[in-house]
Amino acid sequence: MLFRGKQKPASLAHTLVGEWQADTLSGDVRGEITAVFNTDGSYQTKNRMEIRGVAAAPVTQTGRYRIEPIYKQRFKLFTIDDNGQPLSATVRTFVDSNTMINEVGRITFRRVDSGDHPFN
């Protein structure tokens, strides 16, 4: 199922649902992104950053998401905030059912095994 032609949004959304985590590093800034995508189209992200070893206040974002298939496992992820304002549109690709790459910055997200979300 993973590598056939253009998938339907529902199939991609089913693969996206769950908790994902990515680590980032750019110069003196180290970050950790945790994203939870729910079946009802809602999402929540938490960004933690450390600048030169000093932790910055975490930033949490909530809203709704929509998926537009591009080709096979490649899709565009649209997010809006709780007030309906567009936030971002990023192109992502599923490498497999547990690995997703955000094409901006080539950030690799890995599915978190735990069924417990850190935001509950």
Give the role of each language-model region.
Residues 25-32, 46-107:
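Contiguous, well-ordered beta-strand patches that form the walls/edges
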Residues 38-39, 96:
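Structural motif
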Residues 109-119:
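Short, low-complexity, Pro/Ser/Thr/Gly-rich segments in the mature regions of secreted, periplasmic
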Residues 39, 82, 113:
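Short, ordered coil/turn segments that flank beta-strands lining enzyme active or ligand-binding pockets
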